[in-house]
Amino acid sequence: MPVFTDVRPRWSRPASGGAHPPECRVKPLPELTAFLEGLPEPHILFDAQYRILASNAAYRRQFSPQRSVIGRHCYEVSHHFAVPCDHAGESCPLALSRQSGQRERVLHLHHTPRGEEYVNIELSPLPGEDGQPAFYVEKMEPLRVAHSQPDAPGLIGRSLPFQRMLALVARVAPSQASVLLLGESGTGKELVARAVHQASPRAGKALVAVDCSSLTETLFESELFGHERGAFTGATATKPGLVEAASGGTLFLDEVGDIPLPMQVKLLRLLETGTYRRVGSTELRHADIRVVAATHRDLDRMMADGRFREDLYYRLCTFPIALPPLREREGDIALLAPALLERVAAPRRLQLSASAMALLQVQPFPGNVRELRNLLERAALLCDGDVVDATHVEEAIATGRRPGRAPAAPPLPRSPAGTTDLRSLERDTLRALVAAHTGKRAELAARLGVSERTLYRKLRQLKLD
């Protein structure tokens, strides 16, 4: 924990024999409490039974402004859990620290007066006189680049695959390491790159995106490094490159797998030496950039085929992050769909009906979030009222279907009046479709625009099989 760099050794540094001399033992609780109170980030001190012994003003203000936290369990105050985090499906830094005997760091979704917030937690054990941990200190820093609510900016999600990805973003962002984002098309790689930038010390400078797939071999060098006046035909003025524009900030190389092989050598030199030359110049310039790259291509296969340099790959892939496809982010469609609909339908204020949401949640979305966005934009254009219903989603699916694909499903039956539970609506809809269908399940899946496996999974989940 960085804030304990200067003071923690006075509490916990062991002597050469392993024992803690009197001057290095844990100091009295009042002194620890006074130290925590002066820290700007939320901190708590608690024992091995998760009981909070002390908290600073920043913690009380963020998590429990109306009620004392002393004597309460940390998981109760921060998470509203009745059991420790690791018993509720989340990582528990205390449990991890007990196993490792070291400092631990995790990402949690905490409850605050403002609602749920993603929080980076760093836990440090403080040894007692016997050398064993006597207390634990947690430092909490909100991660502002992601949210679990649909009306928030930035990354949106709360599924476990999303949280695992977000934990990697939170871990690498404060460093200067190169990041390689890997994932299918439409998974939001540019949004994740922006999150890495905004959570980094370079957030005050520019994030410059380079679409590598749109640059020809002749344009790549002049766009990236810039050129001098007269360097080539048409170069009527000196032009700084994108590397220079990103100085002090982050250079985002989107679709890095599409960089021509001859240009990969020049990019490698930039990454290895931190220097470059404008086209037509002999002056060596220094690049102050952090590189985040992204691709949907299989770089391992490209390296095996000789289409991507292995040395460049290892320069870019200091810290790889795999972005989960939408089909693996169970529950996130319910968060993403309202947020995307609000953006694509503006200035109209459209709502999604429960039946429309149920239909969206059984779609496979091979195009991921981008496909979901396009589908919602079509549905909004097909809707004349204020509510996008399942019929609008069905029509949007049908009109967006590529030639040769299966026809759209028949209109969904209207749900019973007064039914508001989303799972019940989904069950009623599928039950009616299954009852009305006389052919094979594979045909029904095709008519719904989903795979047979997805249909069987939904039927099992809803106990309709």
Name each region found by the language model.
Residues M1-K27, Y59-Q62, H111, P127, ...:
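Bacterial C-terminal helix-turn-helix
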Residues E23-R61, P174:
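Sensory modules in modular signal-transduction proteins
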Residues R105-L109, Y118-E122, V137:
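PAS/PAC sensory module
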Residues R67-L109:
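Terminal output helix/cap of sensory domains in signal transduction proteins
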Residues T238-G248, F252, P260-K266, R277-H296, ...:
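AAA+/SF3 P-loop NTPase mechanochemical coupling elements
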Residues L168-G234, E244-P260, P325-E330, L375:
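Conserved post-Walker A coupling segment in P-loop NTPases
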Residues S64, R202-K205, G280-R290, D298-G404, ...:
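Nucleotide-binding/hydrolysis machinery
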Residues P125-R164:
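Sensory coupling linkers of modular signal transduction proteins
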